[in-house]
Amino acid sequence: MKATLKIGSILVLLMLGFIAIVSAQSDRKANRDTREWRYEIEAMGTGVQGTYLIKVWTYSKRPDVAIEQAKKNAVHGIIFRGFAGKPGIPGQRALTNNVNLEQEKAEFFDPFFSDGGKYMKFVSITNDGSVSAGDRLKVGKEYKIGVIVSVNVAALRADLENAGMLKGLSSGF
C-alpha cells in the first residue's frame, strides 16, 4: 500500500514538472516572437492630452498571447516606429530618430520590455481585453489580433528622457 502511494506521488510530481516545463517553453516562444517585433499600428482617435489611442495588430499562434504582447508592441511602436494618420486623425513620428537605439541601449530596453516590465506603466487596453470578430484574423498558422490601446506618451517621453534614452524637447535650443 505504501509503495503504491509512493509511486503515485512520484508520478504526480513528474507530471506537474512536465507541465511547468512545457508552459515555460511556450512563454519563451511568445517572448521570442515579440522580440521580432512583428506588428502594425493604426491611429484610432485622439485620447486625453498626452495619450495616443491606437490599434495594434499583433501576430501570434495563440490569440491570448497576442493580446498581452500588443501592449509591448504599442509602446515599442511609439518609441521606435511611429504611425501613419488617417483622415481627421494625425499620425505621429517615433519618439527617437536613432534607429539603433534599442541595440545600443539593450541594457535598458531588455528589462524595460520584459514580462511585467516598466513599459506596463504607460499602456492600457481600452476594450477590457475583448477582441471583436473583425479584429481576430487567421493568417496561415497564426492569428493577427487587433487590440485598441491607450499609450501615455507624455509620461513615456519623460521617463525615457530621465533615463537618458531620449534628448529633452528643449535640448536643441
What is each stretch, according to the model?
Residues 1-27:
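Bacterial Sec-dependent N-terminal signal peptides
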Residues 23-173:
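Domain-level marker for long, solvent-exposed, non-transmembrane regions
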